[in-house]
């Protein structure tokens, strides 16, 4: 990616973008503590993550969320009106179980534990944001954050996210997020920081 100009302007992510979106996010999350826990094999993690994010995009967030991308990053947001719909259906659960293999049960427990701590007030949820490491530091993630946060601000609503990567907390804090609590996932999983940003 060195000599190629990659636009960091957010655009709506459509179905045809699925391969690129999945690739960017798999590269972004390959060293993420939670993804390392769900996909412990260094050898198979990149390919499984690509399938995982591709499935989430095409079968869940792309249908009921607000998905944006740049030329090297992607973000999945869920506005309050999409919250009840942006849950995996039976076929999506089957596909995710296949991708996760023997970690599927742990994954289900972790998702349920995190969901139990989600705010009850109407809010926007930042489900995923990530940039290809080869393009980090070039404003891709920040541009996607600004775009989604502007939508939430226009609606006068707070934004909620969870992160398992301590290195990312300062970036989120820069954008106005505050840690609400630190969660310990069942089954010896990594710490998960629940963060909230008040509307501006």
PLM features per residue range, with description:
Residues 123-124, 145, 177-200:
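Long, positively charged, glycine-interspersed low-complexity recognition regions
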Residues 9-23, 27:
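A short beta-loop-alpha structural element at the N-terminal edge
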Residues 142, 154-155, 165-182, 188-189:
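Conserved active-site alpha-helix within GNAT-family acetyltransferase domains
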């Amino acid at each position: 990616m060195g000599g190629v100009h990659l636009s960091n302007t957010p655009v709506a992510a459509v179905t045809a973008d699925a391969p690129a979106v999945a690739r960017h996010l798999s590269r972004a999350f390959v060293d993420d503590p939670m993804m390392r826990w769900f996909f412990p094999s260094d050898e198979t993690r990149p390919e499984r993550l690509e399938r995982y994010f591709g499935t989430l995009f095409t079968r869940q967030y792309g249908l009921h969320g607000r998905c944006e991308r740049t030329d090297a990053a992607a973000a999945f947001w869920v506005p309050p009106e999409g919250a009840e719909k942006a849950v995996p259906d039976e076929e999506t659960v089957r596909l995710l179980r296949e991708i996760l293999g023997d970690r599927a049960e742990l994954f289900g427990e972790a998702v349920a534990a995190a969901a139990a701590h989600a705010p009850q007030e109407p809010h926007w949820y930042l489900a995923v944001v990530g940039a290809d490491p080869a393009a980090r530091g070039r404003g891709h993630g920040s541009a996607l954050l600004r775009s989604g946060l502007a939508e939430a601000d226009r609606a006068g609503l707070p934004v909620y996210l969870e992160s398992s990567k301590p290195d990312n907390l300062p970036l989120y804090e820069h954008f106005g997020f505050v840690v609400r609590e630190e969660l310990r996932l069942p089954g010896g999983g990594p710490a998960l920081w629940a963060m909230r940003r008040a509307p501006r």
